[in-house]
Amino acid sequence: MDAYLLLDFGSTYTKLTAVDIENEGILATAKDITTIESDIMVGFNKAYEKLTEQLEGKEVNFVKKLACSSAAGGLKMIAIGLVPELTAEAAKRAALGAGARVLNVYSYDLTNKEVEEIKNSNLDIILLAGGTDGGNKECMIHNAKMLAEHGVKLPIVVAGNKVVSDEVSEIFDKAGIFYRVTENVMPKLNTLNVEPAREEIRQIFMKKIVEAKGMSNAESFINGILMPTPAAVLKAARVLAEGTDKEDGIGDLIVVDIGGATTDVHSLADGEPSKPGVTLRGLEEPFAKRTVEGDLGMRYSAISLWEASGTRKLQKYLCDNTVDVEACCKYRAEHIKMVPETEEEIKFDEAMAKVATDMAMERHVGVIESMYTPMGVIYSQIGKDLLNVKCVIGTGGVLVHSKNPGEILKAGSFDMADATHLKPQHPEYYIDKTYILSAMGLLAEDLPDKAVRIMKKYLVKV
């Protein structure tokens, strides 16, 4: 039988999924520790061995082998723009949507100190924006010159004011910098245009980054490392929400991905105001939006999760005021491979997951603000209104292994005690039990209809 082999070179595990193309089913899944320090193929070969054992007795012909990766720290970027709330924020959103970890966002004219900071950062790509089309020219030219003069040699995606793109190209050509020019991330005030920059970032990731991270060994076995893992998850979520010409999507949805270091939230919805008389304010929101909370994680970021939430919030979800939450979080940060075994450990992990879901969702969704005027109260919305989203999908180890995944995801739903945050009110909850989201994002590149049908079949309602 013809099958696709879909790989995710994760930061901790290398995960393999074999998909029967004809019958639209998962044939087998396997995983092993990612071995980025030595040779990434060592961990892959161990996982592949486990996979072939499961496929014993079946005649499987892998017609395509596709991969995504977040190994070696994933795709690390910085964004540079003009105004923090506008072009710098638009650049950040483009980078996040491309599946990157955004290490920093710089605005206005770069200083010598900032450029040295950029130069010494462990980065993969710089996204340079600034000014609307026909707007401010000086800032982007200044920043391009600064990067060139300080000898920055990282790949740069230029996605700012189109009027200065020729001049910026000239600066980078003279300095021998690898760059790509694409459309402005904010061509008009408050108007987002992130897709061209996302695609350019993905192309550079495929060509340059995979090689730089010592992953070219894998390229000989597979057809290509197509994108960073978070971009694959976002792609899967998008095709599931929107559907294809031949297969209906399920409509607006949210994906919550709780990991050891971060909690990612992906929303696929236009987020327009659902209540009458509310006006939108601020930067336009993308239909496919991703936010990453680097301080909300189950292991690496356990201490920062406690610092961000405070003792009281964790104790609220634990329903126990006697637990030393600081000590429990510190232990997890120091023992990142810890697997909870006792009832107390499981309860504490689930309380952490609830805090991560609650806070990550709070930061992702829009807010309603009231303003008093002589005409009465006026309500404005900043960000996305996700009140009416009917589907929330959870993924990540703590959710997959939990006996109460629905309770964890409920922590991210609308709360009357905090009615200004526009979290989903009455959604249905699903779990990605077989870790297929990133795999389906890869499959959707070739066979989107099948990817949608497989997700509908394998996502488990809780």
UniProtKB/Swiss-Prot annotation:
- Source organism, top-level taxon: Bacteria
Known Pfam families for this protein?
MutL
Cysteines paired by S-S bonds: none
InterPro entries referenced in this protein's UniProt entry, alphabetically: MutL
What does this gene product do?
May play a role in glutamate fermentation.
UniProt protein name: Protein MutL
